[in-house]
């Protein structure tokens, strides 16, 4: 239990920030899953569109501070590696 007003305020803020971060993190994971599924389907055009959208969402999440920029770069790199292995 919080003993001060500022501690109570931080608890409220933490809940709000956690919900915000969870929303963007799950959105990012959803788009990455869609991209991986499109890559596995073998349709190059659909996979390319899905990968580009996933990269866009990953960049947005990094700009918002939900994930670190290096994590964003790593996720995009791994996604492109899968894409290139499948279609080259």
From Swiss-Prot:
GO terms for cellular component: cytosol; small ribosomal subunit. Gene3D superfamilies: Ribosomal protein S20. The keyword Iron-sulfur does not apply. It comes from the Bacteria. It holds the Pfam family Ribosomal_S20p. GO terms for molecular function: small ribosomal subunit rRNA binding; structural constituent of ribosome. Keywords: Ribonucleoprotein, Ribosomal protein, RNA-binding, rRNA-binding. One of its GO terms (biological process) is translation. PANTHER family: 30S RIBOSOMAL PROTEIN S20, SMALL RIBOSOMAL SUBUNIT PROTEIN BS20C. Belongs to the bacterial ribosomal protein bS20 family. Binds directly to 16S ribosomal RNA. HAMAP family: Ribosomal_bS20. This is Small ribosomal subunit protein bS20. It comes from Coprothermobacter proteolyticus (strain ATCC 35245 / DSM 5265 / OCM 4 / BT). The gene is rpsT.
